[in-house]
Swiss-Prot record:
Gene3D superfamilies: Aldolase class I
GO cellular component: cytoplasm
Pfam families found in the cross-reference section: His_biosynth (PF00977)
Family that this chain belongs to: Belongs to the HisA/HisF family.
Gene Ontology BP annotations: L-histidine biosynthetic process
Enzyme Commission number(s) from the entry: 4.3.2.10
Lineage: Bacteria, Pseudomonadati, Pseudomonadota, Alphaproteobacteria, Rhodobacterales
GO molecular function list: imidazoleglycerol-phosphate synthase activity; lyase activity
Primary location class: cytoplasm
Pathway, per record: Amino-acid biosynthesis; L-histidine biosynthesis; L-histidine from 5-phospho-alpha-D-ribose 1-diphosphate: step 5/9
Name of this chain's protein: Imidazole glycerol phosphate synthase subunit HisF
Active site (catalytic residues): D11, D130
CDD domains for the chain: HisF
């Protein structure tokens, strides 16, 4: 049985790790290179690096910072933010990323995901979906760092991305982001059930039980968290031990 991955996320703005609530009210959480080194030593399964202002500011990802972060990581590194073309994917892979995440660009031009998957393989192409509840059982995608409504149904879009060659979905509930109230489990379950590829649950972790629920109730293949790890509330080791005790297969450090 595949092991469930625990993935800390570095949301990076102006060269610093930040953490917000509902995509705003950002709080400084440290240096990304130092954070990468610490998470690698702590036994994280992967690391997610998101340049959260790149698309909104209409610029590319911070390649130098990605390279310096990757140099500290022996675990797989997923990088997103400002990724628009297959050339961007190539540049990030060369900078040290193991996987590259499309977000706003995949909504604007779904074909870019297929092109990147054809060139580099589905295994390194992630599509990040930022979704907000708009009605019971219905979730809409927002782009540009959560600033722009699209009118696109999140479940249908996830299915399209899987069919176009995405290897993984990084699913963030905007309603739950930074709230510490737990994952949006109906959203996570709906998309996990709808697509044949792994889903990373993101947005809302405040306790170790929330990580367990993302897998047992949400059906996620991996769970992502930020603030519970960044501010020292729990360690990666504690999270893995808690999940293992709940019967979830994890790679123990």
């Amino acid at each position: 049985m595949l092991k469930t991955r625990i993935i800390p996320c570095l949301d990076v703005a102006d060269g610093r790790v930040v953490k917000g609530v509902n995509f705003v009210d950002l709080r400084d959480a440290g240096d990304p290179v130092e954070a990468a080194r610490a998470y690698d030593a702590a036994g994280a399964d992967e690391l997610c690096f998101l340049d959260i202002h790149a698309t909104h500011e209409n610029r590319g990802t911070m390649y130098d910072l990605v390279t310096r972060t990757a140099e500290q990581c022996f675990m797989p590194l997923t990088v997103g933010g400002g990724v628009r073309t297959h050339q961007d994917v190539r540049a990030l892979l060369l900078a040290g990323a193991d996987k590259v995440s499309f977000n706003s660009a995949a909504v604007a031009d779904p074909g870019v995901v297929a092109e990147a998957a054809d060139r580099f393989g589905s295994q390194c192409i992630v599509v990040a979906i930022d979704a907000k509840t708009v009605a019971p059982g219905r979730w809409e995608i927002f782009t540009h760092g959560g600033r722009r409504a699209t009118g696109i149904d999140a479940v249908a879009f996830a299915c399209e991305m899987a069919s176009r060659g995405a290897g993984e979905i990084l699913l963030t509930s905007m309603d739950r982001d930074g709230t510490r109230a737990g994952f949006n489990l109906p959203l996570t379950r709906a998309i996990s059930d709808a697509v044949p590829i792994p889903v990373i649950a993101s947005g809302g972790v405040g306790t170790l039980d929330h990580l367990v629920e993302g897998v047992t109730e949400g059906g996620a293949s991996a769970v992502l968290a930020a603030s519970i790890f960044h501010f020292g509330e729990f360690t990666i080791g504690e999270a893995k031990a808690h999940m293992a005790a709940a019967g979830i297969p994890v790679r123990l450090a």
